[in-house]
Amino acid sequence: MKLKRILALVLALALVFALAACGGDGKKDDTKADAGTADTGKTDDAAAAGSDAPADDAAASDGAKFADGGTLRVGVKNAVEGFGYQDPLTGEYEGMEIDIANMLADALGYDDVEFTTVTAATRGELLDAGDIDCVLATFTITEERKQSWDFSTPYYTDAITVLVEDASNITSLADLKDKTVGVSSGSTSAKALVEAMIDAGVIPGDNYDAEAFQIDTWTDGVKFQQYADYPDISTALAAGEVDAFCVDKSILAIYKTDGRHYIDESFSPQEYGVATKKGAPISAEIEKLITGWLDDGTIDGLIGKWNLG
């Protein structure tokens, strides 16, 4: 009996040690599995979009992305169909620039995107104030603007033209002489129109100084009325407050309804880029992504999707 009790005790102790060893191994494996899921959740999402996506260009050599979660704050237009448009019923944004913003957020490692409606007059101010991280809002790249903000390689190129009512009998730059033209505050349209009219010999260029040009004081051969945004200019054109509406053609297309037409000329190519704060670390990462998407045809696909070709 004594021998049996000793054998039973030995077997019991062996069982305890065996169970302890198994329990320790199981806990370590679970910890590894949890950590792997947390580290690779966003990577799996990116992989689902295509292993050849240039999002990898925004990753560091150790596989880490620019952002570790958080929200990418993007300034966009809300009334430019095809680029940035906010559905009045759902509040949802859509358009080529909205798609690019979502792609940037995913490739850079953000969890979410927050859209803020901007105008030509407010987009730079909001960027400077740190209220948004970048701007995708038909923002034309100019040498002057590049002194204030970083811009990516252009993802879209447009040209400026002029929209008028059929009843106006305006068909060319020459017909705009001594007329009043509606433009958006903070845009480059007025300056481009003056230069085009000077180049065409419609108005003299003696008093024109590109660096000193001011929309509200220019009256030499053509005058301008500034408005907060494009729908306001379209309304003013219909009401006869202005004789013409001048901006990029892709934007004017939204307002070219029956009874309206473009003048014969287009001028001043407009290159749209992603704008970021001057010297911001995100600037270089966005540049890599945009150039990658231009090279692999992704941007062309978006232009086709939104009928902007």
Please give the residue ranges for each predicted region.
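Periplasmic-binding protein-like
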Residues: 78, 156-164, 249-291, 308-309
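Bilobed "Venus flytrap"/periplasmic-binding protein-like clamshell domains
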Residues: 74, 78-82, 93-106, 158-220, ...
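Acidic, polar ligand-binding/catalytic clefts
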Residues: 113-175, 260-266, 279
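Ligand-binding clefts/hinges and TM-proximal coupling segments of bilobed small-molecule sensing domains
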Residues: 58-64, 68, 111-114, 188-224, ...
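A ligand-binding cleft/hinge motif common to bilobed small-molecule-binding domains
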Residues: 138-148, 192-195, 231-268
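Short helices/loops that flank or line small-molecule/ion binding pockets
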Residues: 103-107, 114-117, 121-135, 148-150, ...
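Bacterial lipoprotein signal-peptidase II cleavage site
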Residues: 5, 20-51
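Extracytoplasmic small-molecule ligand-binding "clamshell" domains
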Residues: 52, 60-138, 285-286, 296, ...
